[in-house]
Amino acid sequence: MNIAVIGLSHKTAPVDVREKLSVPEDVRERALQHLCGYAHIQEATILSTCNRLEIYIVTSDTEVGVREVHQFLSEWSHIPLPQLRPYLFILLHQDAVMHLMRVASGLDSLVIGEGQILSQVKRCHQLGQQYKSIGPILNRVFTGAIAAGKRVRTETSIGTGAVSISSAAVELADLRLQNLQNCRIAVVGAGKMSRLVVQHLIARGVKEIRIINRSLERAQELAQQFPEVRFELFTMTDLLPIVAAMDLVFTSTAATEPLLDRDNLGAVLVGDRSLAIIDISVPRNVHANVTELGTVQLFNVDDLQAVVAQNQEARRQLAQEAEGILEEELETFLAWWHALETVPIIRSLRQKMEAIRTQELEKALSRLGSEFADKHQGVIEAMTRTIINKILHDPTVQLQSQRDLESRQRAMQTLQDLFNLEPIEA
């Protein structure tokens, strides 16, 4: 079995491409069923965040399995494969495993060391288990990556004071508007990202915030976490008039279609007062055409790069320390994986050796006579087992220690050919 990851991220694709490949949780089961319906995909799970869409698979045939994922991505996004392919990356075997470890540790994030990605990797693993799309191999890949992510955060300082997407959004707002305390501010959405935006606004002295959310109850739960701030809470029916009255709006909802566009926003804006909108959602909550309204400034997650870059250099140095931890965790995984892959051929070889040992032992004992056999059978039995174990020890260790996939598979094929083995299922 082969491990692969196929996907795209903030490093390979702009937000207008990433949003078309987003796989929200409410459709995750359908997407996983679709993936696992392909003939060459035995296990699969999907990591979908605002900055990445990655599909992890276990496949019996790497080339065909990757091709099946490409087909899925093209169908899901409605983007022809020739247009989509330049944005995609493919990593195989241990490179795919190391990539997930780096992702879970925050080393591959837009914001190096950010902590939210570890929770997202855990959730990806949970959903794969819940929908029964992952088996023993991906289960071990993800438990190893999660363990690696925890170690990096525990044993290094990479997460200390890390900029997050939410804090970068507030930083960008502060750079653009300067005095946030005197701005009329609204946050659209009441999830984790919105909570972090509120938290960072409060840290900059903001005392009044409007929350707009589909569920008023969720908005109330968010507001109750920050009793020191005066909140006004609204449902989505009030979205347009509230936004039109603001100086600054943050949007972070799970909506799959834009909530704001040139037409609906233009209909409610009055006068020439400026409005800044920072959209940290993927798919985007705000259509790019709002910038055609002369008084509106729009920023999305890709516009946060400059803000994030300010504290990245120090974090890159800490990331080198984290890479050593990941190498240790990768070694642990590879030892397990290599042993797992070689189990069928080793078991088949041992079964053949045991059959020969048993057959020859019976012949020898029958020639020695019943009196000798009864007296010494236990000793001879133990001796022959020890001989078999010692003969097989070195080939077993050498086979399991082969790190290179092709070399290991050649060695397994050689054993099968030399001993005329019939491989059994793992």
Swiss-Prot record:
Entry annotated with the keyword NADP: yes
Reactions the enzyme catalyzes: (S)-4-amino-5-oxopentanoate + tRNA(Glu) + NADP(+) = L-glutamyl-tRNA(Glu) + NADPH + H(+)
Site annotation Important for activity: residues: H99
Intrachain disulfide bonds: none
Binding locations of NADP(+): G189, A190, G191, K192, M193, S194
Entry keywords, A to Z: Chlorophyll biosynthesis, NADP, Oxidoreductase, Porphyrin biosynthesis
Binding site for substrate: T49, C50, N51, R52, S109, E114, G115, Q116, Q120
Molecular function GO terms recorded: glutamyl-tRNA reductase activity; NADP binding
Keyword Oxidoreductase (UniProt): yes
Protein purpose: Catalyzes the NADPH-dependent reduction of glutamyl-tRNA(Glu) to glutamate 1-semialdehyde (GSA).
Name of the protein: Glutamyl-tRNA reductase
